[in-house]
Regions:
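Primarily recognizes the serine-hydrolase "nucleophile elbow" in alpha/beta-hydrolase
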Residues: 116, 248-303
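Short beta-strand/loop motif that positions the catalytic acidic residue
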Residues: 363, 369-371
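Alpha/beta-hydrolase active-site loop
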Residues: 230-252
Length: 430
């Protein structure tokens, strides 16, 4: 659930610009670098901007769409980003029709991001979210075929369904060494997608000589669109075991050099797997989540988390903003859907099971723990607890504000995060 946090008005008057060209006939830029007063909206904007590092967005497109969004309104966010995605997709298809493969690829990659960004706040998690999520995947699949080498679509059999994903391989890997390449499995969080993980892990890993598998697991939108009953589960070592089984049988994968990298909620999933499965030879936790219940209480606030009144998704339909903020209405629907529970209280009880507890000392492979210094007191506390309790060698990195990488999952500096992550992985398994 997303809390509504606004920045207080400044007491001091706003300083005037030292130089203004408003009355000039030459204007260098009419674009203003402006975000939102709502902190979560700002983070989601940074999240969309961040993937520009690997071709997933452009600064101009993201800043232009801000003007179409009402601060704090999930509905206007979803509509504005969907319109942007449609415009960019149309350009990409025009380039494809004209035989301009590189231009088509670039546009379709960005359209995929903008559809995913719209999906995050789509008003209905079973309707609008489904539509934009499918279009995000469709654009990425077409772009993936235009990459060099093409990204491979994978379907991992699991419990009567399948987990969709992508295997991203380095250039020239078709003639790779006997025994295969080191391989990283990227594990996303509550609202991530395999397509987004391509920009965070797939592209930076492939250019460093790694295979990278990114996938959508139980509870994540890309999985639930095709497997509606595959909701989140605390024993994520089970689906991750199926992913490792799939990779271990491939000749282009070195099964003795398998690593996991979990982002956000995904770090809990990855840590569970590393504790249970000795085939995992290295683990990256970004940031470590050892207790999801504590984490969520700190995020939404104690009063909201412990409220005595239970709320079901159907209870909030049409409720005015002044009675229940739109973001909270959206959040209740999203958490109930993804966890497969009927109400807020049922969700609060369910996430009690998402704790590492005594499992952390069982993680004996090398571990890299990452966190941004401005993620907040609770993530930093869980980071320190995890580092202290891990049973194997651990390297810890706190990203600083001055490095431009202090946000959640270093969404503001993916290239720096990738450098730290893959340099460490090369030292362990390269």
């Amino acid at each position: 659930m997303t809390p509504v946090v606004t920045r207080p008005d400044r007491d001091r008057p706003e300083e005037e610009s030292a130089v203004s060209f408003e009355d000039s006939d030459v204007v260098r830029s009419a674009v203003r670098v402006e975000g939102f007063r709502d902190d979560e909206f700002n983070y989601q904007l940074i999240r969309a901007l961040g993937v520009a590092d690997y071709g997933g967005s452009t600064v101009g497109e993201c800043l232009a769409v801000v003007a179409e969004i009402t601060d704090g309104s999930p509905r206007t966010w979803a509509l504005a980003f969907e319109r942007l995605a449609e415009r960019v997709e149309d350009r990409g298809r025009g380039c494809l029709d004209a035989g301009r493969r590189v231009s088509a690829r670039d546009h379709l990659l960005r359209a995929s991001t903008y559809y995913r960004t719209a999906e995050y706040y789509a008003e209905s998690v079973t309707d609008g979210s489904h539509r934009t999520g499918e279009r995000s995947r469709a654009c990425f699949v077409e772009a993936a075929a235009l990459l060099d080498p093409p990204v491979e679509l994978v379907e991992i059999p699991f419990e009567g369904g399948s987990l969709p994903g992508y295997l991203v391989r380095p250039a020239g890997s078709d003639a790779g060494p006997a025994g295969g390449l080191p391989t990283l499995i990227g594990v996303g969080g509550f609202d991530s997608s395999a397509e987004e993980l391509y920009f965070h892990m797939g592209a930076p890993g492939a250019e460093r000589g790694w295979n990278v598998l990114v996938f959508d697991g139980p509870g994540q939108p890309g999985c639930m669109r095709r497997n509606p009953d595959m909701t989140f589960r605390p024993d994520y070592e089970v689906p991750l075991g199926a992913v490792i089984d799939h990779l271990s049988g491939r000749p282009d994968v070195d099964a003795d050099r398998l690593a996991l990298a979990g982002q956000s909620f995904g770090s809990y999933f990855a840590a569970r797997s590393a504790a249970a499965d000795r085939r995992v030879r290295a683990l990256v936790a970004n940031p470590p989540v050892v207790d999801m219940s504590r984490y969520m209480e700190a995020w939404v606030g104690k009063d909201v988390f412990r409220m005595t009144r239970d709320i079901r998704p159907e209870d909030v339909i049409g409720v005015p903003e002044d009675l229940l903020p739109h973001q909270m209405q959206w959040g209740i629907g999203a958490i109930c859907h993804r966890f497969g529970v009927p109400s807020f209280h049922a969700w609060r009880q369910a996430i009690e099971a998402y704790r590492l507890g005594g499992l952390t000392p069982s993680i004996t492979c090398p571990v890299l723990a990452l966190v941004g210094e401005r993620e907040g007191a609770e993530p930093l506390d869980q980071f320190r607890s995890f580092v202290a309790e891990v049973g194997g060698p651990v390297t810890s990195v706190v990203f600083r504000t001055e490095d431009g990488a202090s946000t959640h999952c270093q969404s503001d500096n993916i290239r720096l995060s990738a450098q730290v992550t893959f340099d460490w992985l090369d030292e362990q398994l390269g």
